[in-house]
From Swiss-Prot:
Function in brief: Odorant receptor.
Keywords, comma-separated and alphabetical: Cell membrane, Disulfide bond, G-protein coupled receptor, Glycoprotein, Membrane, Olfaction, Receptor, Sensory transduction, Transducer, Transmembrane, Transmembrane helix
Disulfide bonds: 100-192
Full protein name: Olfactory receptor 3A1
PANTHER family in the cross-refs: OLFACTORY RECEPTOR
Major location category of this protein: membrane
Membrane topology (Extracellular): 1-28, 83-103, 162-199, 265-275
Family: Belongs to the G-protein coupled receptor 1 family.
Gene3D superfamilies named in the record: Rhodopsin 7-helix transmembrane proteins
Organism of origin: Homo sapiens
Length: 315
């Protein structure tokens, strides 16, 4: 990210984030709402992580991935919300270019790992339902760790690629971002150099990072649905659909908001719709995930309850 002298000779070394609302009277309301959402998200995800760690009944591949997903949700919301709350308190909207790039990198890192981890969870459900006899060998602890490590490696490469590509652009004014965090679409519109290569890179990498995992998830659940429909027990079908339904809900929200956000780079002006999608990506998704998984999962509910009441599992 190359700061350059603008028309008046000043050097662009920072960006101005306008935030969600410009009305001063509504800033305290925004602060309270986002602080509440942040605390609920952190507590909910850490509760699931703690339950997975201490409850023997949850020491399975599915909950191993769920625990990792909880860590990612905490990381994702922590990249954007605390800095926004800090700006609301200090009433300072300026963000240095370096801090903007750092936020961009970590946001895409956590979102990228999330993308691959959701695919690993779909693969786990496919093996558990469609290949139950070989499930324990195909989804061993070594395989689980390899899937998580590969997710982090791919996401790190993706985040670093976009960050380095963004650092090559020139910014010579204006420097006002009509958003509450730094991301690719907003920065593209402020660049005074061509962003065609960056946008092409975003679409190409996005196809690999999002298109391939999405296709694998769809294929996995087509096989899962076919296998579940062959189950004679009504209770068995209900349990299988309940487990898969939670995951599919999270996948739909995650990919739906992501596609809307990054596939609209041709728009000439960012609107409040982009802010709403940004809230979904950074706040709503991490907050809903523990609610979705625990609400429809009696094992997680009972594990969290036993952990809170100090009771031990009989398993």
């Amino acid at each position: 990210m190359q700061p350059e002298s603008g028309a008046n000779g000043t050097v662009i070394a920072e960006f101005i984030l306008l935030g969600l609302l410009e009305a001063p009277g509504l800033q305290p309301v925004v602060f309270v709402l986002f602080l509440f959402a942040y605390l609920v998200t952190v507590r909910g995800n850490l509760s699931i992580l703690a339950a997975v760690l201490v409850e023997p009944k949850l020491h399975t591949p599915m909950y191993f991935f769920l625990g990792n997903l909880s860590v990612l949700d905490v990381g994702c919301i922590s990249v954007t919300v605390p800095s926004m709350l800090s700006r609301l308190l200090s009433r300072k909207r300026a963000v240095p270019c370096g801090a903007c790039l750092t936020q961009l990198f970590f946001f895409h890192l956590f979102v990228g790992v999330d993308c691959f981890l959701l695919t690993a969870m779909a693969y786990d459900r496919f093996l558990a339902i469609c290949r139950p006899l070989t499930y324990s060998t195909r989804m061993s602890q070594t395989v689980q760790r390899m899937l998580v490590a590969a997710s982090w490696a791919c996401a790190f490469t993706n985040a670093l690629t976009h960050t380095v590509a963004m650092s090559t652009l020139n910014f010579c004014g204006p420097n006002v971002i009509n958003h509450f965090y730094c991301d690719l679409p907003q920065l593209f519109q402020l660049s005074c150099s061509s962003t065609q290569l960056n946008e092409l890179l975003l679409f190409a990498v996005g196809f690999i990072m999002a298109g391939t995992p999405m296709a694998l998830i769809v294929i996995s659940y087509i096989h899962v649905a076919a296998a579940v429909l062959r189950i004679r027990s009504v209770e068995g079908r209900k349990k299988a659909f309940s487990t898969c339904g939670s995951h599919l809900t999270v996948v739909a929200i995650f990919y739906g908001s992501g596609i809307f956000n990054y596939m609209r780079l041709g728009s000439t002006k960012l609107s409040d719709k982009d802010k709403a999608v940004g809230i979904f990506n950074t706040v709503i998704n991490p907050m809903l995930n523990p609610i979705i998984y625990s609400f429809r999962n009696p094992d997680v509910q009972s594990a969290i309850w036993r952990m809170l009441t100090g009771r031990r599992s009989l398993a």
